[in-house]
Amino acid sequence: MSRADEGRLIHLAKKREREKEDIEQQLRKLEEDKEKCRVGITNKFMANYETVEEVVKSKTYGLVSLDDMKNIQKNEISNRDLQVARGDQSSSTQSKDSQEAREKEEHVAKHTQKRFLSFAFDDEEDEEDAAPIIPKKRVGMDPTVDTSFLPDKEREEFLRKKKESLAAEWRVKQDAEKNEEITVAYAYWDGSSHRKNMKIKKGNTISQCLGRAIEALKKEFTELKSCTAENLMFVKEDLIIPHFYTFQDFIVTKAMGKTGPLFVFDSASDVRIRQDAALDYGESHPAKIVLRSWYEKNKHIYPASRWEPFVPSKKYGRNFDDLSDL
């Protein structure tokens, strides 16, 4: 026997048991209704009989003939029977209405109860009525609640576009500033100062500045004819500046050296940032261009002894040895 046949037999056995229980329940209900009717009729007749006797006694005063007594009793019994008939009709109507209401409630309860797991076949389940779908009510949202922390695609897209536009605007502004020309004062240092000026763009690197300085100085100094930018050092405010930095980097960040700001090109009237500075922007120290070979030979001698590589994260300031420059 296959599993499908076993399942069908189990289903049929359960169906027979349910039918048997329904028949027994109906028989019990009939017995209960029959008992109720019997008790109700007995009570009605007993109550009616007692009521008729009381009415007859109340209507007879003193000595009454037998015929009059029988007539009064007969009239009261006929009136009572008429009232009982009317009461049965109204009670039957009420019982019928209550039975219909009860059947309706049972029908609703049957169709709204939860459907449990069943091993019945699909064709047998289709015979049963489908449970009605109760639509879920949507709970309204409170407009006063802060929802800024929740993900919002429209807001995120708006912020992304705004950031991109600001970044593009910043890049355009930076490119425009990098193309601005500035005048840089520098001096070739070989133990003595040979000061010159050079016009250069803010976006140029220190290496490019050294290359242009070589072109201007090699006519006067023969040691620079075969020199390249890698053989030179750029010293500003006692700091050795790496070649990959641009002038714009120091102007924007307002980087400070040991004796003042590295580069200030805002206006000629600006006093140097440090409060203990004694010189104006126009008289600030020019940048020194030095051969590396000369520095290696003389780095123990002043002023090369005070030079050190530039570190962006380090804060530089005057020390007691710098007071001699005032």
From Swiss-Prot:
Pfam families: XAP5. Disruption phenotype: Reduced growth and mobility. Larval lethal. It comes from the Eukaryota. It comes from Caenorhabditis elegans. One of its GO terms (biological process) is chromatin organization. Residues 77-111 are annotated as: Disordered. This is Protein FAM50 homolog. Residues 97-109 have a biased composition (Basic and acidic residues). InterPro entries: FAM50A/XAP5_C (IPR048337), XAP5 (IPR007005).
